[in-house]
């Protein structure tokens, strides 16, 4: 494959409901959509899932745009690629900037799937035609969060994740368990705690959580290992895992019992599959996280989550969870608590170009 043209779409969409985590609240989602066209006329789309502010990782929409324009796309347009798993090597001289890299790699995978006339799930090694999915409830008042859980349970979601922080944890989980004693429930702290909060976190064991996600800082492998020895609730690492090497370190040290895989955070689908395989070899279950993304990334997550070791319902909610109208057709839809996994290229999700144009603030074109 030789990429002859790359188009960047800087987009912005309003969320149906403002989303709040321990690090902040946002009402609109700014993103970058990448469209690649090869010399044979095949087209692929990817999505850069960085946020506008550096509160999840150091990357932002602006920094990703800089790296894409000034480095990554220049290298891509000079290269010849036989398979998408070659893309990470193409960019290995560029440090980190994994979300920008993942956006390009996602577009290459999409283009490659069309060339091969196979579904993305098939190419990645998926073995399921549908996946169970969960939903995330952002920080809000306890009554509001209880109502949201009730609403999403009625819609068929199989697993519920609530965002927590030190002043909004025990009482929240207590009320949830009072109202919903048997739902699969997990809590996401987004690094809001320190090891000094160990006793506070031990109290959460009584709520029979599936896991507590990223309680400590992203670099705290040693402290997570120490905390895991003192609490019964399984620790899941999210922000700590940027690569296969990070997963190896975490598992070797005993820093977690579950791993969250997000293609954007780890640099793309190729690294995601490698982390999945390593975790499966070491009996560590994985699940696919979400980034409040649009349909392009969401659809690629659906394909990834069809791999065999994704045994926990992921944060792959229906498009209608966040958007009045998504940028793909058909939209990702929930049916009986599950999302379908396209089994052929003819049934893949397609970009709605009209909707993409509506939300585009700026377009930048690069040619070979």
Residue ranges of each PLM-predicted region?
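Structured beta-strand/loop patches that form or line metal/cofactor-binding pockets in enzymes
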Residues: 1-44, 49-55, 323-325
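N-terminal amphipathic alpha-helix/helix-capping segment at the start of soluble metabolic enzymes
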Residues: 1-5, 118-129
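Metal- or metallocofactor-binding catalytic centers and their adjacent structured scaffolds
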Residues: 5, 37-39, 43-115
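Conserved, mostly hydrophobic/aromatic
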Residues: 34, 41, 104, 117, ...
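A cross-domain feature marking catalytic cores of carbohydrate-active enzymes
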Residues: 48, 135-137, 162-164, 187-191, ...
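Metal-dependent enolase-superfamily TIM-barrel catalytic cores that perform enediolate-based chemistry
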Residues: 122-231
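Shared catalytic-loop signature of beta/alpha-barrel
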Residues: 219-236, 241-338
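C-terminal extensions of enzymes
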Residues: 321-368
């Amino acid at each position: 494959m030789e990429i002859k043209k790359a188009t960047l779409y800087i987009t912005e969409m309003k969320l149906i409901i403002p989303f709040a985590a321990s690090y902040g609240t946002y009402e609109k989602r700014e993103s970058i959509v990448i469209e690649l066209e090869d010399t044979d006329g095949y087209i692929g789309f990817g999505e850069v899932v960085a946020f506008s502010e550096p509160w999840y990782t150091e990357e932002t929409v602006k920094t990703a745009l800089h790296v894409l324009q000034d480095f990554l796309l220049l290298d891509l347009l000079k290269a010849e690629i036989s398979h998408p798993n070659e893309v990470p090597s193409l960019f290995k001289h560029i440090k980190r900037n994994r979300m920008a890299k993942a956006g390009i790699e996602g577009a290459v995978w999409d283009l490659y799937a069309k060339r091969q006339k196979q579904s993305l799930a098939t190419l990645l090694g998926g073995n399921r035609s549908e996946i169970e999915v969960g939903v995330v409830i952002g920080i809000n008042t306890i009554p509001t969060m209880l109502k949201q859980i009730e609403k999403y349970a009625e819609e068929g979601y199989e697993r519920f994740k609530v965002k927590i922080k030190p002043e909004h944890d025990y009482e929240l989980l207590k009320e949830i368990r009072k109202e919903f004693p048997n739902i699969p429930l997990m809590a996401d702290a987004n690094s809001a705690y320190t090891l000094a909060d160990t006793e506070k976190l031990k109290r959460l064991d009584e709520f029979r959580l599936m896991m507590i996600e990223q309680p400590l800082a992203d670099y705290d492998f040693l402290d997570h290992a120490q905390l895991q020895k003192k609490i019964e609730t399984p620790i899941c690492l999210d922000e700590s895992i940027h690569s296969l090497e990070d997963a190896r370190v975490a598992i070797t040290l005993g820093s977690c019992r579950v791993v969250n895989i997000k293609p954007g955070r780890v640099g793309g689908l190729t690294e995601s599959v490698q982390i999945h395989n390593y975790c499966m070899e070491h009996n560590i279950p994985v699940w696919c996280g979400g980034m409040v993304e649009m349909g392009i990334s969401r659809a690629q997550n659906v394909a990834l989550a069809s791999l065999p070791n994704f045994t926990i319902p992921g944060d792959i909610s229906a498009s209608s969870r966040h958007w009045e109208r998504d940028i793909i057709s058909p939209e990702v839809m929930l049916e009986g608590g599950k999302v379908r996994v396209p089994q052929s290229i003819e049934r893949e999700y397609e970009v709605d170009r009209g909707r993409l144009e509506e939300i585009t603030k700026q377009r930048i074109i690069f040619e070979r």
